[in-house]
């Protein structure tokens, strides 16, 4: 189609699935996994009303992460303890599911603080913890090391809410003897104001950034 070609990013694995959050079969749950760990930087909304997912990230995440879990349909906002405790439950389920591939490949084991979340959608509804947990093992077993345009379209579509089409971009540049790749996906339809609001933008690169 009219989307540019995208390539894989070294050190990143991705997968997406329908957790039936929309009850129509569309993909709505995504996992980004960094087997060797990854530095990350983040800009959150400045609103005083934030998702429990943001509260989790602020409390747990350090500079280095190993997994990002993104769900749509439910913003995990105004969910209180149910939403926050639910994230812990999901994180522990993910840790258990990752054990096999980490043991098989000699990866350092993921810890709770290595996992961050992003949630978008309706506010004030109970966070669908069980639906998400029930699809974690599928996400892990279907992680893709090689990401072509179709894979990137799949994950870009999985983070959408009211968007009319997925948003994604890719570029690469030669630095010395190395080709550095940068890929990005985003969601948001009139949602960037105020202060990022409910917009998501995820940018991945294999550049050596500390």
Region spans (language model):
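Non-cleavable N-terminal signal-anchor transmembrane helices
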Residues: 1-5, 87, 99
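N-terminal amphipathic/basic leader segments beginning at the initiator methionine
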Residues: 1-45
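Basic, gly/Ser/Thr/Pro-rich low-complexity segments located predominantly at protein N termini
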Residues: 6, 16, 78, 85, ...
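Glycine-centered structural positions embedded in regular secondary structure
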Residues: 11-14, 67, 184
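Short, basic and Ser/Thr-rich N-terminal targeting/leader segments
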Residues: 25-27, 50, 153, 167
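Glycine-rich phosphate/pyrophosphate-binding loop regions near the starts of catalytic domains
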Residues: 32-89, 116-118, 191-210
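Glycine-rich, mobile lid/loop segments that gate access to catalytic sites or pores
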Residues: 93-104, 109-210
């Amino acid at each position: 189609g009219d989307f540019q070609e995208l390539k894989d990013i070294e050190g990143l694995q991705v997968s997406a699935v329908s957790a039936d959050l929309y009850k129509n079969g569309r993909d709505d749950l995504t996992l980004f996994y960094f087997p060797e760990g990854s530095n990350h930087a983040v800009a959150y909304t400045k609103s005083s009303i934030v998702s429990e997912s943001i509260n989790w990230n602020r409390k747990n995440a350090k500079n280095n992460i190993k997994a990002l879990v993104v769900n749509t349909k439910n913003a995990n906002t105004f969910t209180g303890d149910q939403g926050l405790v639910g994230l812990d439950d999901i994180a522990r389920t993910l840790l258990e599911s990752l054990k096999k591939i980490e043991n098989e490949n000699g990866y350092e084991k993921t810890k709770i603080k290595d996992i961050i979340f992003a949630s978008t959608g309706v506010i004030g509804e109970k966070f669908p913890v069980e639906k998400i947990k029930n699809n974690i093992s599928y996400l892990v077993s279907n992680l893709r090391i090689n990401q072509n345009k179709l894979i990137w379209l799949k994950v870009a579509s999985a983070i959408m809410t009211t968007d009319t089409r997925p948003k994604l971009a890719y570029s690469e540049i030669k630095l010395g003897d190395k080709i550095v790749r940068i890929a990005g996906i985003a969601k948001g339809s009139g949602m960037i104001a105020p202060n990022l609001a409910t917009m998501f933008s995820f940018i991945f690169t294999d550049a050596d950034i500390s």
